[in-house]
Regions:
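Sec-dependent signal peptide recognition
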Residues: 1-5
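C-terminal motif of bacterial Sec signal peptides marking the signal peptidase cleavage site
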Residues: 9-11
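Accessory terminal helices/loops
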Residues: 15-37, 242-317
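Metallo-beta-lactamase
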Residues: 32-44, 48-51, 77, 84-85, 127-194, 200, ...
Length: 317
């Protein structure tokens, strides 16, 4: 996954200090100090209360800085993603709620499904990519870059196992297809599922209309947005970000899946404008060394890392 280049891109973004050699050298993001932290019995996870009945569960000691979300209803709780699988997440979830927990994933990439195996009630997109993860997980050789000193601070793991790290297979309660008006009722609050392919074929976002909350998965976050995987589709991505931007006037808080757990709804409109500047050729790529496989386009609050071949295909259609 071009890991060395991506680590450099992450390091050189405005969100972190310049060019880290070891992830342990990186401080926590200063913006986190403005949020309400919830104490938990875990060194690996940092938990913040970010909305009414909403907890952000961060993994800041791996360079992915992935964020899972626990959404509390009256009758059940919804866990949106389960993280890297580097440390069991269920003990932390059990400290936050006694309600039955249902898991749904923003998409099938390994950094969002790592803890799925810990839960009995996982509902999943009915896609080939997700079904492959269910059956096989992800082998160590595909994720070993996540446990190098450049990518992780092992000091915070209970039982570090760099040689054995892999994403485990998991069981699902049922698969769901793309449909309109798909709601996840939690008791006292209904969460709408939005289908937002592009970053991956099976991407979803969640929308809590009553509270004005929008969870964007990897379709948007304030950092380098990766658009280079074999399942990335730029045409679909453009349509998906327009769907999210159309909700910006109704949304009070945006909850992305990486780096910082709270973003402003106005960023969604900026996202569409920025992407259009990229594909039109108005925005020039910044230099990323000698690697021509990907191009990086920087904006004030985020950037795009796009496989050059995909971008050329989009521009030439």
């Amino acid at each position: 996954m071009l890991l060395a280049l991506l680590l450099l891109m992450t390091a050189c973004s405005t969100e972190k200090k310049s060019e880290p050699q070891l992830w342990c050298d990186q401080p926590l993001r200063p913006e986190l100090a403005q949020l309400e932290e919830v104490p938990v019995d875990s060194k690996w996870f940092k938990v913040y209360r970010v909305g009414e009945g909403v907890y952000a569960i961060l993994e800041p000691y791996n360079f992915q800085e992935v964020i899972s979300y626990l959404i509390i209803g009256e009758n059940k709780a919804l866990l949106f993603d389960t993280g890297m699988g580097l440390e069991p997440i269920s003990p932390t979830i059990n400290q936050l709620t006694d309600l039955p927990v249902m898991v749904v994933n923003s998409h099938s990439h390994y950094d969002h499904i790592g803890g799925n195996y810990e839960f009995d009630n996982v509902i999943a997109r009915n896609t080939l990519a997700m079904k492959e993860r269910v059956r096989q997980g992800v082998a160590h050789d595909q994720v070993r870059g996540e446990v190098t000193p450049e990518a992780i601070c092992l000091d915070y793991l209970t039982n570090p196992d760099t040689a054995g790290y892999a994403i485990k297979p998991f069981k699902t309660s049922y698969y769901f297809n793309e449909m309109s008006d798909f709601l996840l009722p939690l008791g006292g609050r209904d969460i709408q599922v939005l289908f937002v392919p592009g970053h991956s074929p099976d991407g979803i976002a969640l929308y809590d209309e009553d509270n004005g909350y929008l969870w964007t998965g990897d379709t948007f976050y304030e950092a380098p947005i990766w658009l280079f995987d074999k399942g990335t589709n730029l045409v679909a991505y453009r349509k998906s970000i327009e769907v999210l931007a159309a909700l910006s006037a109704k949304v009070d808080k945006v909850f992305p899946a990486h780096n910082l757990p709270v973003s402003s709804p106005e960023r969604l409109n900026e996202l569409v404008t920025a992407f259009d500047q990229v594909v039109s050729g108005e925005k020039e790529a910044v230099k990323t060394g000698d690697n021509a496989e990907v191009s990086k386009f920087e904006f004030e609050h985020f950037s795009f890392v796009i496989r050059s071949q995909l971008l050329e295909g989009f521009q030439n259609q």
